[in-house]
Amino acid sequence: MTKRAMMIAALACTTLIAGCSGGSEGKGDDAGKAGSESADATSGMPASWKATDACSIITSAEMAEVMKAEVSEATVGLVNEANGPNAATSECTYIFKDGGRASVMTRWSPIGDNDDAAIGGAKSTVAATVKAFTDRPVEDVSGLGKAAFFVPKINQLNVYLDDVRMVMVTISSAPDATAKDQAIALARKAM
């Protein structure tokens, strides 16, 4: 496993774990209705934003359009169904015909725990972790959901769309010069 791949895996896990640490008891009453009029009857997750199928949130066609590269394979994995206060998650891994890779991780929380404290904690944790690999700081990105930040060098964009939804776009094979703009364009498709 390359150093870059290990860094991406470490940051993805760190961000998801840190994002789960917010305390939001009592916020779940209407949280599952954000973004959709109909919701999954068992979990409350919006039917139009199924976090357990990240490949449906950003499709292969949308990925190909933004990346200007044909997607040869898209695979969903790391699926976790919502259960009580535990979030629903998944990851879609896209492989391009040219050998490039990208991934999209999605998260929906039944308790609306994407509060300022959880987001700040996740960002601080990522910033501390990334210092081991680069001297470039984590960058805030405005105009995307409730909060967003970009991790240079590994080309990862973390977007907290609202109190219940989060998307993490990682474009490890994209050139550093275009990766941030491409990740932002992909995140907009998840909104």
Regions found by a protein language model. Name each.
Residues 40-51, 55-56, 64-65, 134-191:
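A short, solvent-exposed beta-edge/loop patch
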Residues 1-18:
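Sec-dependent bacterial lipoprotein signal peptides
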Residues 31-90, 94-96:
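Extracytoplasmic low-complexity, Pro/Thr/Ser/Ala/Gly-rich segments
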Residues 70-144:
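Short, solvent-exposed recognition patches
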Residues 11-14, 36, 150:
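Short stretches within intrinsically disordered, low-complexity N-terminal or propeptide regions
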Residues 19-37:
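Bacterial lipoprotein signal-peptidase II cleavage site
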